[in-house]
Amino acid sequence: MAQLTNSLNYLFSVSLLLFVSFHCLCFRFSLVAACSNSTDDQQIQHHHHRKWVGPSGHKVITVSLNGHAQFRSVQDAVDSIPKNNNKSITIKIAPGFYREKVVVPATKPYITFKGAGRDVTAIEWHDRASDLGANGQQLRTYQTASVTVYANYFTARNISFTNTAPAPLPGMQGWQAVAFRISGDKAFFSGCGFYGAQDTLCDDAGRHYFKECYIEGSIDFIFGNGRSMYKDCELHSIASRFGSIAAHGRTCPEEKTGFAFVGCRVTGTGPLYVGRAMGQYSRIVYAYTYFDALVAHGGWDDWDHKSNKSKTAFFGVYNCYGPGAAATRGVSWARALDYESAHPFIAKSFVNGRHWIAPRDA
């Protein structure tokens, strides 16, 4: 009996020791996890203050139609770059008109298209939204782009992108024809041309900076939900009856997206709306911009005239000039901004540019 009692006491002691050890171990893991979460929170809070490392190394790939280069096709040059690329790759494109559709996938960041000048180097195609794709279905707008970029840190310099589909008349269906679609983050464009009619430039998503570019079209020829600055660009309308420059797709007030046109020139034919509320909380600002006498009465359009977007959209102008400038303030819900309210849209901080745009490029 005594031996049984001793055995039971021993088993109880061992069980108690295991119980206490288990709970101590659980407490330790909980403490480590809590500390880890705290550290993660601090890392998240300081994420935007960390120095960007960028790509490692640089490589140049050449393209020429005459065969005196590594590739004859821009797409072939893109395809030669490995997935998950971590080098800065410049694709140097010789003068010529490259008739092809080009896609830069999300797995290939840090690519630059460098042309010999926007008047002599161009990539062009002719798809429309109503055209049929390989699956027998209509392409729809976003798939018509002559060039589509999904990758981050894309750059284009001194090159043009064109959709050669003919311009539609107002009200014609299925004639959307995109020249360029940018869906990647932190993209930079300098000295580029974008040529089309309806929906020329699909500024789809991400932060983008366009400097000294020429953008031509007729209806909503800059559209999407990007967070983009257009600095010292020419926005040229080829509208035959009426047209519109920008249609922004911001859908909720928490989004930081918007189009900021700073120091631009608006030229061409009209009458022309300077902005349309594609999204319920569309956001478009013009500052220090010249307007030809082509702005439509009212200046702005709320898209469908039944969603009360005029109450939620943010359309603003600051220090604009030219014979058409007064018309940009033609509706009560277009805001005449003062410097304080305009400043967030006229500095490159609007696109967090200090972290990824070189000072010489700003």
From Swiss-Prot:
SUPFAM superfamilies: Pectin lyase-like
GO biological process, one term: pectin catabolic process
Tissue expression remark: Expressed in young siliques.
Subcellular location: Secreted, Cell wall
Glycosylation sites: 37, 86, 158, 308
NAD is among the record's keywords: no
Gene Ontology molecular function: pectinesterase activity
Signal peptide: 1-26
Residues that hold substrate according to the record: 141, 176, 276
Pathway named in the protein's UniProt entry: Glycan metabolism; pectin degradation; 2-dehydro-3-deoxy-D-gluconate from pectin: step 1/5
Catalytic activity: [(1->4)-alpha-D-galacturonosyl methyl ester](n) + n H2O = [(1->4)-alpha-D-galacturonosyl](n) + n methanol + n H(+)
Main localization (coarse): secreted
Annotated EC: 3.1.1.11
Record-annotated site: Transition state stabilizer: 198
Active site as annotated: 199, 220
InterPro entries for this protein: Pectin_lyas_fold, Pectin_lyase_fold/virulence, Pectinesterase_Asp_AS, Pectinesterase_cat
Keywords, comma-separated and alphabetical: Aspartyl esterase, Cell wall, Cell wall biogenesis/degradation, Glycoprotein, Hydrolase, Secreted, Signal
One cellular component term from this protein's GO annotations in UniProt: extracellular region
PROSITE patterns xrefs: PECTINESTERASE_2 (PS00503)
Family label: Belongs to the pectinesterase family.
Function: Acts in the modification of cell walls via demethylesterification of cell wall pectin.
Protein name: Probable pectinesterase 68
Organism encoding this protein: Arabidopsis thaliana
Name of the coding gene: PME68
